[in-house]
Amino acid sequence: MEKRKTIKVTLVKSLIGTRHSHRLVIKGMGLRRLNHTVSLCDHPSIRGMINKTAYLLKVEE
């Protein structure tokens, strides 16, 4: 069975003053607080979420 590629995403900037839609995207990725890291599968929809909120995140492949 092949291993799926994962991406580690960390929230590095506060959500204060950001657009409501960006806050919902961050919540949808499972990020809750500053410096919280989650591992997500490398999928086009996840990539789109990362691109939309890239200014708030640190991404490791």
UniProtKB/Swiss-Prot annotation:
InterPro entries: Ribo_uL30_ferredoxin-like_sf, Ribosomal_uL30_bac-type, Ribosomal_uL30_ferredoxin-like. One of its GO terms (biological process) is translation. This is Large ribosomal subunit protein uL30. Keywords: Ribonucleoprotein, Ribosomal protein. The keyword Ribosomal protein applies. The gene is rpmD. Belongs to the universal ribosomal protein uL30 family. One of its GO terms (cellular component) is cytosolic large ribosomal subunit. The lineage of its organism: Bacteria, Pseudomonadati, Pseudomonadota, Betaproteobacteria, Nitrosomonadales. It comes from the Bacteria. One of its GO terms (molecular function) is structural constituent of ribosome.
